[in-house]
């Protein structure tokens, strides 16, 4: 098969494309393909087809391929990139298509006129940015290097400064040199789009700059200006937008306003030649009071859009609550989001129909009614007549100020609760009862540790009514005491009371963080290490669920760097992860458990001087494991006392309830006599080991016996455990009752 271009060499390259739904195949030799790749269609025709005379052929096979590559139909209207050799092009060889439109200017095609939007009143009022706007005007008024770049965190109002500049130009409140200027926002993505062939992007940029020079009234605004570095460069020697703009920016031929974040501005700073042509203008995050002023300025716009009313308390709550509880965002953006979302939510309850929509539906029904009348389909005509009358009734309904929904502080609080899962509203009746009874509910499950329960309950109550310290966690406690006395159990029950499940907490076993290199897992690996892109195990979970309970089990086993990390968390309620994000712990409850020092102190049971001496001894032993600055940052160091036999009797009841819950799936119920319970306590009592031996005793004497009895007698569902001959025996409850009755009759 010969090359379709030169008809001399063997075709070794086959190109496939789809044009207007039809598959096309082009067969080329290596030489013709290289010519086409480097020089485009004109070079290919000049080199290969000159001898064949095929360059003017109206249906040349290459036309479709180049039309497809350039995003146009060969027979349709050609863009300004169409080579003059193609039929239908702008050259003398191709007749003009009568349907072809006159091409728009590059600025109209790839830009949005912000000044025109300001004239039409389509932009929101810009409030509290007078200093930044004044600084931008001063830079634009310079002779050279008059290109301000607004830098600041996302959502602080950088684009609003440019809109404020456009509004001042419309109002005439600018120097004479800036009068009648047009601020046009350039879309860099659209500018790059469709420039896959080498040289197309440079040509488009050159035409854009020529147009700006001719007009001499354009201030070009590029949002995310760091995109111009590398834009249009395909890696094969093409120049990017930044390099093309450099000469014009230096001489003042082109006035450019940019906006980007602090992190992304570093991309521009890497190109020193480009960076020196720009003048940075820092846009800081507004304060809460300034945010309230901004919200009041745009309040009317959101009220008109959502057909609602905002109270002054709602405006203030949006600023204060967003600043307090929404951590990853910046003012005023996150406060405006609360206004917008609360308005959207309230608007859903409003029975309001757009008048323009009603008019359109009435006109449509009128035309259909007339068509039905002409077709003598009177039943259908009557249907449309009734529909028109209903629409006219709707048209008369108007939403008055009395009917308009009002957004209050409670509505804003509900939005914050939905976003963060943090309860910030007024105490509901159920929650109020829960907080009142919190200590009693915890004491019912955590036996013998009343002091620890009371301190935890008071800390949560303080935080819930707004008396907590603003920059510290809800509470931070170190639980110390011998093993098996309920330190971890108290944390589980607290999570169950607050979040509904004992597993709803962020729990870390500190034995996993004994090595120095493993500490980085909490906040993420540092740059240059494996796992840098992965989030920290602690910081990411707290960032997603700020209202949470964090349990660090056996803290004395952790590497000292973990405690150094928590110094800042316990004091300031914040920590920066490996990605540079600041994570707030202000709404978290931090509990650490430890049995450090208890091994050196003899366990004792009871009250009085002996216990007081033991307490002092344990706290003295803690200094051997923890530094003073670490222990000094806790809200409380709570010692858990050893359990007495009376405590164990109550714990036995709780453990037996768990056994009944497990066997209840098989419709079995177990009753245990008081004598059997006391026997279980005698077998499992060990002050040094706490309640854990009791669980093993119940497993050996109760659970194993139940399993044996049920396998032999599956028909019995009501079981009883009793002490017979100093042994715990499982039997059928009916049988046990009968035997007891027989023994009592002779005694009478």
UniProtKB/Swiss-Prot annotation:
<feature type="region of interest" description="I">
    <location>
        <begin position="107"/>
        <end position="354"/>
    </location>
</feature>
<dbReference type="InterPro" id="IPR018368">
    <property type="entry name" value="ClpA/B_CS1"/>
</dbReference>
<comment type="function">
    <text>Along with ClpP could be necessary for degrading proteins generated by certain types of stress.</text>
</comment>
<dbReference type="InterPro" id="IPR027417">
    <property type="entry name" value="P-loop_NTPase"/>
</dbReference>
<keyword id="KW-0346">Stress response</keyword>
<dbReference type="GO" id="GO:0005524">
    <property type="term" value="F:ATP binding"/>
</dbReference>
<dbReference type="InterPro" id="IPR019489">
    <property type="entry name" value="Clp_ATPase_C"/>
</dbReference>
<dbReference type="GO" id="GO:0016887">
    <property type="term" value="F:ATP hydrolysis activity"/>
</dbReference>
<keyword id="KW-0862">Zinc</keyword>
<dbReference type="GO" id="GO:0005737">
    <property type="term" value="C:cytoplasm"/>
</dbReference>
<feature type="binding site">
    <location>
        <begin position="152"/>
        <end position="159"/>
    </location>
    <ligand>
        <name>ATP</name>
    </ligand>
</feature>
<keyword id="KW-0479">Metal-binding</keyword>
<dbReference type="GO" id="GO:0034605">
    <property type="term" value="P:cellular response to heat"/>
</dbReference>
<dbReference type="Pfam" id="PF10431">
    <property type="entry name" value="ClpB_D2-small"/>
</dbReference>
<dbReference type="Pfam" id="PF07724">
    <property type="entry name" value="AAA_2"/>
</dbReference>
<dbReference type="InterPro" id="IPR050130">
    <property type="entry name" value="ClpA_ClpB"/>
</dbReference>
<keyword id="KW-0143">Chaperone</keyword>
<feature type="region of interest" description="II">
    <location>
        <begin position="407"/>
        <end position="598"/>
    </location>
</feature>
<feature type="region of interest" description="Disordered">
    <location>
        <begin position="74"/>
        <end position="104"/>
    </location>
</feature>
<feature type="binding site">
    <location>
        <begin position="481"/>
        <end position="488"/>
    </location>
    <ligand>
        <name>ATP</name>
    </ligand>
</feature>
<keyword id="KW-0067">ATP-binding</keyword>
<dbReference type="Pfam" id="PF00004">
    <property type="entry name" value="AAA"/>
</dbReference>
<dbReference type="InterPro" id="IPR036876">
    <property type="entry name" value="UVR_dom_sf"/>
</dbReference>
<protein>
    <recommendedName>
        <fullName>ATP-dependent Clp protease ATP-binding subunit ClpE</fullName>
    </recommendedName>
</protein>
<keyword id="KW-0547">Nucleotide-binding</keyword>
<feature type="zinc finger region" description="C4-type">
    <location>
        <begin position="3"/>
        <end position="32"/>
    </location>
</feature>
<dbReference type="InterPro" id="IPR003593">
    <property type="entry name" value="AAA+_ATPase"/>
</dbReference>
<dbReference type="InterPro" id="IPR001943">
    <property type="entry name" value="UVR_dom"/>
</dbReference>
<keyword id="KW-0863">Zinc-finger</keyword>
<dbReference type="InterPro" id="IPR001270">
    <property type="entry name" value="ClpA/B"/>
</dbReference>
<dbReference type="GO" id="GO:0008270">
    <property type="term" value="F:zinc ion binding"/>
</dbReference>
<dbReference type="InterPro" id="IPR028299">
    <property type="entry name" value="ClpA/B_CS2"/>
</dbReference>
<feature type="domain" description="UVR">
    <location>
        <begin position="359"/>
        <end position="394"/>
    </location>
</feature>
<keyword id="KW-0677">Repeat</keyword>
<dbReference type="InterPro" id="IPR041546">
    <property type="entry name" value="ClpA/ClpB_AAA_lid"/>
</dbReference>
<dbReference type="InterPro" id="IPR003959">
    <property type="entry name" value="ATPase_AAA_core"/>
</dbReference>
<dbReference type="Pfam" id="PF17871">
    <property type="entry name" value="AAA_lid_9"/>
</dbReference>
<feature type="compositionally biased region" description="Low complexity">
    <location>
        <begin position="80"/>
        <end position="99"/>
    </location>
</feature>
<comment type="similarity">
    <text>Belongs to the ClpA/ClpB family. ClpE subfamily.</text>
</comment>
